[in-house]
Amino acid sequence: MKCDYFERGDCLSCRNIQLPMVEQVSVKQQQLIDLFRGISVKQWLAPILSAESGFRNKAKMVVLGAAHKPILGLVNPKGEPVSLCDCSLYPKDMQLLLHRLERFVQQAGIPPYRVDKSKGELKFILLTRSQSSGQFMLRFVLRSDQAIVRIERELPQLLQEFPEITLVSANIQPIHMAILEGEREIFLTETTRLEEQLNNVPLFIRPKSFFQTNPEVAAQLYQIAREWVTEFKPNYIWDLFCGVGGFGLHCADSNIRLTGIEIESEAIECAILSATKLGFTQVDFSALDSTHFAKGQSAQDKPDLIIVNPPRRGLGKSLCDSLSEFAPKAIVYSSCNPHTLMSDLEYITGYQITKVQMFDMFPHTDHFEVLVMLEQL
C-alpha cells in the first residue's frame, strides 16, 4: 500500500506497508509455523485477514507545534513535528475529525506540552471510534486542569459540527514525562462510555479500558472462539484477563455459568453492563489479578473450560501451573505475543494442541494475534 508518510521517512510504524497484504500474511504465518516446529498441532487453520486501510478504531496523537499552529501526530526521526491526520489506517470520518481537532486546539488557544521544557498544557489527544455506530470518544490529556475552561468554551461548536462525538473527557497527567495518561479523568459530557457491537454482542469502552484496535478482525476472533467453545458444551467457563468481556460474553448463554477476571475496574464495569444488557444472570465479573484469583480457587468448583487472553508478557509459570492443576476439558488461549505463548505452552501440562489460527490484527507490522485450542489428553 502506498503511504506518503512512510515514503518520506516521517512515520515508520508500519514497517511492512510496502509489501502486498498477501505477502505480509504469508510471512507472519510462516513465522508462527516456525515457532511451533517440533510441537504437535492437529490442525492449522487458514489465517484471518484484515482490511488494508481504514481498519483502526483508535488514534493516539501527540500534540505538537504551538497554540496558534498545533499539530496532531508525532516527531519524525529528524526531530520535526508531523501531522498524522491523514494516516490511511483511520477511517475517513476519523481523519476529518482529527483535522477539525487541530483547528479546535488552535481556537481554544491551548499550548501543546513541551517535554524538553516542561511547559505547556495539552499532551495528547486520544480518539476512539465505535465501528457499529460511528460514534466517538474524545479525550484530552492535560498537564493540569487549567485548560479545561478553554475546552468547555469551544466544545459546544465542535459537538454541533460532529454530533457523533458522544463522550468527551479530560485526563490529567501532571508528571513531566511522555506518559500517555494519568489517574484522574474528568468527564465533560453526560455519557461516560462508548458502545460497540460485535456479532450482536454489546460491548462498552470506558476511557481507560482496553479494546482491540481492529474491530473487524476482533469480531472474527470472538466468533471463532465462540465456535470452538460451543463444541465442548461447557457448563462453567472462566474468562481470565477478560477485559470488557469480549470472549466470555460471546461464549456464554443463559445456561452457562461464566466468571470473568480482569484487573482493570473500568473494564469490569463495562463487562457487567454488557452481561446485564444480554440478560445473562449466571455471570460474575470481578476486578482481580488473574493469577491470584486462580491460586485462591477450590478444586471442587472448577470450570469445564478456561479462556485466557493475557497481555504481551503472557501467563507466567504460576498461572500455567494453576491451569494444569484445574485440568479443564479445554483451554482457549488468545495471544498477541507468540513468543510468550510458546513459553506458556511449555508449562501447561496434560494437553494437546488441536487448533491454531493466526489473525492479522495489526496489518503492515510484524505483530499478529493467534488463537490456540488445547484439549485434555
Curated annotation (Swiss-Prot):
Enzyme class (EC, first level): transferase
Q: Which GO MF terms does the UniProt record name? A: 4 iron, 4 sulfur cluster binding; iron ion binding; rRNA (uridine-C5-)-methyltransferase activity
For this chain's UniProt record, which GO biological process terms are given? rRNA base methylation
Residues recorded as binding S-adenosyl-L-methionine, renumbered to this chain, are Q212, F241, E262, N309
Record-linked Pfam families: tRNA_U5-meth_tr
- What UniProt keywords apply to this chain's record, in alphabetical order? 4Fe-4S, Iron, Iron-sulfur, Metal-binding, Methyltransferase, rRNA processing, S-adenosyl-L-methionine, Transferase
Where along the chain is the active site annotated?
C336 (nucleophile)
Q: So where does [4Fe-4S] cluster get bound? A: C3, C11, C14, C87
Q: Which InterPro entries match?
A: 23SrRNA_MeTrfase_RlmC, MeTrfase_TrmA_AS, MeTrfase_TrmA_CS, SAM-dependent_MTases_sf, U5_MeTrfase_fam
- Which reaction equation describes what this protein catalyses? uridine(747) in 23S rRNA + S-adenosyl-L-methionine = 5-methyluridine(747) in 23S rRNA + S-adenosyl-L-homocysteine + H(+)
EC number(s) stated in the UniProt entry for this protein: 2.1.1.189
- Origin superkingdom: Bacteria
Task: Supply the PANTHER family for this chain.
Answer: RNA M5U METHYLTRANSFERASE (PTHR11061), TRNA (URACIL(54)-C(5))-METHYLTRANSFERASE (PTHR11061:SF30)
Give the family this protein belongs to, as stated in its UniProt record: Belongs to the class I-like SAM-binding methyltransferase superfamily. RNA M5U methyltransferase family. RlmC subfamily.
| Function as written in the Swiss-Prot or TrEMBL entry | Catalyzes the formation of 5-methyl-uridine at position 747 (m5U747) in 23S rRNA.
Mind telling me what this protein is named?
23S rRNA (uracil(747)-C(5))-methyltransferase RlmC
Species in which this protein is naturally found: Shewanella frigidimarina (strain NCIMB 400)
The gene that this protein is the product of is: rlmC
